[in-house]
Amino acid sequence: MRRDFGKVAVLLGGKSGEREVSLKSGAAVLAALRRNGVDAHAFDPAERALSELAGFDRVFIALHGRYGEDGTIQGALELMGIPYTGSGVMASSVGMDKWRTKLLWRAAGVVTPDFELVTADSNFDAIERKLGLPLFVKPANEGSSIGISKVKAAGGLQAAYALAAKSDPLVIAEQFVGGGEYTVGILGGAALPVIRIVPANEFYDYEAKYLRDDTQYLCPCGLDASLEEQIKAEALQAFRIVGGRGWGRVDFLMDEAGRHYFLEVNTSPGMTDHSLVPMGAKAVGLGFDELVLSILELAHVG
């Protein structure tokens, strides 16, 4: 593994609702780089002008959510000509937008739970009838399960929409799939082992992701080996369809009949002690430090 990365900025913090998670991810990445002799420096774009990045040779993006994961920072780095980790402008923008990701996947034949765009003047009862109950309501452009709620009873969609709309004007309602939550990490051109997520809460929300210690992460995931390999190949293809590159994560659900549905793509996954890509990497013998260096090795412009 090469170490001549030059001066590296670790982008962390930022202005999104996922700032605290990003600070944790960035601190872990920064420590790993420094342990391996990399000249790495923390850089919080909420506190410093982006023009100050001009003195850096590479950027490790540990930002999550708006401005860091949606193509905004990627576009700035493209203009500055500084190689950065993860996906480019288009894939970051599409991947952040759950609605457009699902539209693209559906057009390409990727199976995803049925969904509807919800607006203030939607026929809420008709959407409930079409998708069935329970259903999930999500802001299209938030991560870490911010603003998500589960509608269990008829007539509950309007209130769930109002909650989600506080986070983003674009809101989707999504069919409930109840057989289990899973994720596939992507590193370079390969999919990592599938991880099954078993939250103690009703679903894998912000609390389960970052604050609780009783969420179970199962790897091996319990799926038949041939099915797991099939899903890994499909996850890699789903990642590529949105233009993903470098590294990322693709989440999927299983229904009770054993059918899988791809849920969303994450182009800048978490790197905290609760995070999933490091778990998948560990399962193939790749430690956290080696994972961080591998991601930085894949930094690019264009």
From Swiss-Prot:
Residues that bind ATP: 128-183
Q: Which GO terms describe its molecular function?
A: ATP binding; D-alanine-D-alanine ligase activity; metal ion binding
* A GO biological process held by the record: cell wall organization
Cofactor(s) required for function per UniProt: Mg(2+); Mn(2+)
Lineage, top-rank taxon, reads: Bacteria
Protein name (Swiss-Prot/TrEMBL): D-alanine--D-alanine ligase
Q: What does this protein do?
A: Cell wall formation.
What keywords are annotated for this sequence in UniProt? Answer: ATP-binding, Cell shape, Cell wall biogenesis/degradation, Cytoplasm, Ligase, Magnesium, Manganese, Metal-binding, Nucleotide-binding, Peptidoglycan synthesis
Major subcellular site: cytoplasm
Question: Which Pfam families has this protein been placed in?
Answer: Dala_Dala_lig_C, Dala_Dala_lig_N
Give the E.C. number(s).
6.3.2.4
Indicate the family of this protein: Belongs to the D-alanine--D-alanine ligase family.
Compartments it resides in: Cytoplasm
Recorded hits in InterPro entries, A to Z, give: ATP-grasp, ATP_grasp_subdomain_1, D-Ala_lig_Van_CS, D_ala_D_ala, Dala_Dala_lig_C, Dala_Dala_lig_N, PreATP-grasp_dom_sf
What pathway does this protein act in?
Answer: Cell wall biogenesis; peptidoglycan biosynthesis
Q: Where does Mg(2+) 2 bind?
A: 264, 266
Q: Which reaction does it catalyse?
A: 2 D-alanine + ATP = D-alanyl-D-alanine + ADP + phosphate + H(+)
For this record, an example GO cellular component is: cytosol
ATP-grasp domain ranges (all copies) = 102-297
The note on the cofactor says: Binds 2 magnesium or manganese ions per subunit.
Specify the taxonomic lineage. Answer: Bacteria, Pseudomonadati, Pseudomonadota, Betaproteobacteria, Nitrosomonadales
Residues that hold Mg(2+) 1 according to the record: 251, 264
